[in-house]
C-alpha cells in the first residue's frame, strides 16, 4: 500500500468513528421497545453499503475511502457480537434470539433500500 491509500483509509475511518460515536452517544430511539444504538449504526451502515454497491464504484481511491475507511470503522459488528454474548451470559435466550434476527433482518432491509433507491435514481 502506498501513502495515498493509507491516507484515504485513515481519513475515511476518522469520519466513520466520529459519526459512530455521535450516534452511539446522542441518539435515543424508542418505538415501543428500545433499539440499541449499536443496532442503529449497523442499520445506517447497511443502508450506505447498499447505496455504494448500487453506485458500482470502480475508482480504487473511493473504495478505500468509503468501503474500507468510513464503513469499516463506522459499522459495529464486534459490538453486535458482544451484545449477543452478554445476553447469552445473562441467559436471556429469547432476547438473544430476537436481537440477532432484528439486526440481521433490518440490516438487510436497510441495505436493500439503499441499493433499490439508487437503482431508481440512476
Swiss-Prot record:
GO cellular component: plasma membrane
Chief subcellular location: membrane
Gene Ontology terms: biological process: cellular detoxification of fluoride
Compartment annotation: Cell inner membrane
Family designation: Belongs to the fluoride channel Fluc/FEX (TC 1.A.43) family.
Full protein name: Fluoride-specific ion channel FluC 2
InterPro entries assigned: FluC
TM stretches of this protein: 3-23, 38-58, 62-82, 93-113
Catalytic activity: fluoride(in) = fluoride(out)
Binding site for Na(+): 72, 75
Keyword annotations: Cell inner membrane, Cell membrane, Ion channel, Ion transport, Membrane, Metal-binding, Sodium, Transmembrane, Transmembrane helix, Transport
Activity control: Na(+) is not transported, but it plays an essential structural role and its presence is essential for fluoride channel function.
Bilayer disposition of the protein: Multi-pass membrane protein
Amino acid at each position: 500500500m502506498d501513502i495515498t491509500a493509507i491516507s484515504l483509509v485513515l481519513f475515511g475511518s476518522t469520519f466513520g468513528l466520529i459519526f459512530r460515536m455521535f450516534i452511539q452517544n446522542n441518539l435515543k430511539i424508542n418505538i415501543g421497545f428500545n433499539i440499541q444504538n449499536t443496532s442503529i449504526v449497523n442499520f445506517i451502515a447497511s443502508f450506505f453499503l447498499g447505496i455504494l454497491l448500487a453506485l458500482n464504484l470502480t475508482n480504487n481511491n473511493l473504495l478505500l475511502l468509503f468501503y474500507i475507511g468510513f464503513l469499516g470503522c463506522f459499522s459495529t459488528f464486534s459490538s453486535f457480537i458482544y451484545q449477543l454474548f452478554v445476553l447469552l451470559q445473562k441467559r436471556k435466550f429469547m432476547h438473544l434470539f430476537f436481537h440477532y434476527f432484528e439486526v440481521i433482518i433490518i440490516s438487510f432491509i436497510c441495505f436493500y433500500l439503499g441499493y433499490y433507491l439508487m437503482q431508481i435514481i440512476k
